[in-house]
Regions:
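Hydrophobic alpha-helical transmembrane segments of multi-pass integral membrane proteins
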Residues: 42-69, 185-208
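Membrane-interfacial helix-loop connectors
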Residues: 69-91, 95, 99-121, 159, ...
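Hydrophobic core segments of alpha-helical transmembrane domains in multi-pass membrane transport
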Residues: 8-21, 53-57, 125-137, 150-162, ...
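Helix-loop-helix hairpins and the membrane-proximal interhelical loops
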Residues: 1-46, 145-194, 212-215
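Cytosolic, long alpha-helical scaffolding segments
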Residues: 79, 105, 218, 244-250, ...
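Membrane-embedded alpha-helical segments of transport systems
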Residues: 57-66, 85-102, 119-125, 155, ...
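Short helix-coil transition sites and intra-membrane helix breaks within transmembrane domains
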Residues: 24-28, 57-65, 166-167, 195-204, ...
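Interfacial loop-to-helix junctions that mark the boundaries of transmembrane helices
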Residues: 1-7, 109-121, 175-181, 221, ...
Length: 590
């Protein structure tokens, strides 16, 4: 084997791994996090969990990616450990699809149909189409499709390069002796495991074995331990990922490890015992790419069928290794203050990570609303317990802003679609508004505290006016949060007219107070408090307007806030004017 053959082999391996990664990334981006959301929601049934694990892994072409995602689910409390077991078992089945794709290189025959099925025939076409779309396509989905096609073509080209590089070794006695050593089950497993740990992909390890099979020097007896070792080696990615995670997440990684170890040892013992008795004829025959795919699939499918009914064994083993603490609640959903749904493992799947950010932002919005409404209810009937809760909620919202902001900045550096980038920008804007609303809640609560400490109260007229104003504020807050949560654009159009009504209420209430002050019906001290509350109300409505405008802008692809606001509130905007008149009449001051 000369230097050029070595370079061809290593170069082919590099292209193979790059093509696999490119295709996998394209598939992940094309799915937009939908596959992960399906995994999260539809795994309550054990059989369904196995099937979904297999399906998702087959699509994204990586069992490691699936198991790491599952570790993230368990760490964040989204998925229980018992539900995770089935997904992990299914992931091992799904990863065998790659071997079947690579086995297409062995298709022979002169018919047009068979020729078209050969990767050497259609890979160049995929590469040409992929490059053309990548260079000319403007839509994100088109570019994702191009990445999938190019990744597949590069993967197949790398496979052919490796096969071509090792083909001359078919006549080498030294090469045959080396491969014969792998027939030793322990050595073969260790080599397969070690190589998989090195390249972090069991699919790639099995693919390289398929490339080596063209020499005819790889027997089935040598291939089996290598395949088994690759299955064990694939568990290291999840184990590494679980470092620093919760105890339950570590258990999920251990479930993957124990499942692969036990199924491998069980299969090896059964195979070698039966082979010693019956002397399987196929064991000494040269392995083929198709044969390797059959072994890989049969082994994993059989293991899933056999162990699924007794999958709780692996869960118990994980609990024996990492015992349950007295303070630990089994499969608990963490307190939202921990924001564990923002798991860094999800950053590898930006679409899903963004969905988790949206969920966290919705929680943040509701905490901010709770703080505001609780503070408003303190006006005229202050109590220390409720005031403490307002402070607690405001601090929680601040924590959310810090955590969410940092997470979104990390997420922004990942490969996001254009739509996801816009949604991320909207989230960054909105969480700032939610945080400011909670700050105004503190201000309102302090005004209520001052009234209580000084035994002050509003006049009956001022109280009636404030009741109307409060109704409008609660309405705009509820509406804007619902707009954010549901992305209801029709409802969003109602926010700006209501904000204009609130501006009018703010100005009118202050004007009326000055009149009462001149007539001696109100004190200057109460005037300051009323003005503070009214100003905070008006500023809350401004933040609600910002939230609704962000959602409307996202839909219209328009990010010039001031221009957009001017357009929708223009004097000739019929819909706006009608809605404004309706709300003005509804929130008429007495």
């Amino acid at each position: 084997m000369n230097i050029f053959m070595v370079l061809s082999l290593i170069g082919g391996l590099a292209l193979f791994l790059y093509g696999m990664q490119m295709m996998g990334d394209g598939l992940k981006k094309a799915s937009g996090g939908k596959l992960e959301m399906i995994l999260e929601k539809l795994t309550s049934n054990k059989l369904m969990a196995v099937l979904l694990g297999a399906g998702v892994t087959a699509i994204i072409q990586s069992s490691s990616a699936t198991t790491v995602m599952v570790v993230g689910f368990v760490n964040s409390g989204i998925m229980s450990l018992s539900r995770a077991v089935g997904v992990i078992m299914g992931a091992n089945v799904g990863t065998t699809v790659t071997a079947w794709i690579l086995s297409m290189t062995e298709i022979t025959g002169q018919s047009l149909f068979l020729q078209l099925l050969k990767p050497s025939s259609f890979s160049p076409i995929l590469a040409i189409v992929g490059v053309a779309i990548l260079m000319t396509g403007k839509k994100e989905k088109q570019r994702d499709g191009a990445a999938i096609m190019l990744g597949f073509a590069i993967l197949m080209f790398g496979m052919e390069m490796m096969s071509g590089a090792v083909e001359p070794l078919a006549e080498s006695e030294e090469f045959q002796k080396v491969l014969l050593m792998f027939a030793n089950p322990v050595l073969g497993m260790l080599v397969g495991c070690g190589f998989t740990i090195l390249i972090q992909s069991s699919s790639a390890a099995v693919g390289i074995l398929q490339a080596l099979s063209v020499t005819g020097a790889v027997t089935n007896l040598s291939a089996i331990p290598l395949i088994m070792g690759a299955n064990v080696g694939s568990t290291t990615t999840a184990l590494i990922s679980s470092i620093g995670a919760s105890r339950n997440a570590k258990r999920a990684a251990l479930v993957h490890f124990y499942f692969n170890i036990i199924k491998t040892v069980t299969f090896m013992l059964l195979f070698y015992c039966f082979n010693a008795i019956f002397h399987f004829a196929f064991a000494s025959e040269p392995a083929t790419a198709v044969g390797i795919a059959v072994i890989h699939s049969s082994f994993n499918i059989a293991a899933a069928i056999i162990f699924t009914p007794v999958s709780s064994i692996f869960e118990k083993m994980a609990y024996l290794t990492i015992p349950k603490l007295e303070s630990e609640e089994e499969d608990r959903i963490p307190a939202k203050s921990e924001i564990q749904i923002l798991d860094t493992r999800f950053l590898n799947t930006p679409g899903y990570a963004l969905e988790q950010c949206k969920n966290a932002a919705i929680d943040m919005a509701n905490y901010s609303k709770e703080a505001l409404f609780l503070a408003i209810d303190q006006i005229g009937k202050f109590d220390k317990k409720s005031a403490a809760r307002v402070i607690e909620l405001e601090e929680l919202v601040d924590h959310y802003e810090d955590e969410l902001g940092s997470y979104l900045v990390k997420l922004s550096s990942r490969h996001l679609t254009e739509k996801d980038s816009q949604e991320l920008s909207v989230l960054l804007h909105c969480i700032g508004d939610f945080e400011r609303i909670s700050d105004h809640a503190i201000n309102i609560m302090e005004s209520a505290r001052e009234m209580n400490d000084k035994s002050l109260s509003f006049s009956k007229k001022a109280e009636e006016e404030l009741t109307v104003f409060t109704g409008a504020i609660k309405d705009i807050v509820n509406t804007s949060i619902l707009v954010f949560q549901e992305e209801d654009l029709k409802l969003a159009l109602q926010v700006e007219p209501l904000e204009e009504v609130i501006d009018h209420l703010n100005a009118e209430i202050k004007k009326r107070h000055i009149k009462r002050l001149r007539k001696g019906k109100c004190t200057i001290e109460m005037g300051f408090i009323l003005s503070d509350i009214s100003t905070n109300y008006e500023r809350v409505s401004d933040h609600c307007s910002n939230i609704a405008l962000c959602l409307l802008q996202l839909n219209e692809d328009n990010f010039d806030t001031h221009m957009y606001q001017e357009n929708i509130s223009a004097s000739d905007n019929k819909d706006f004017n009608e809605e404004y008149k309706r709300l003005r009449a509804h929130y008429q001051l007495p």
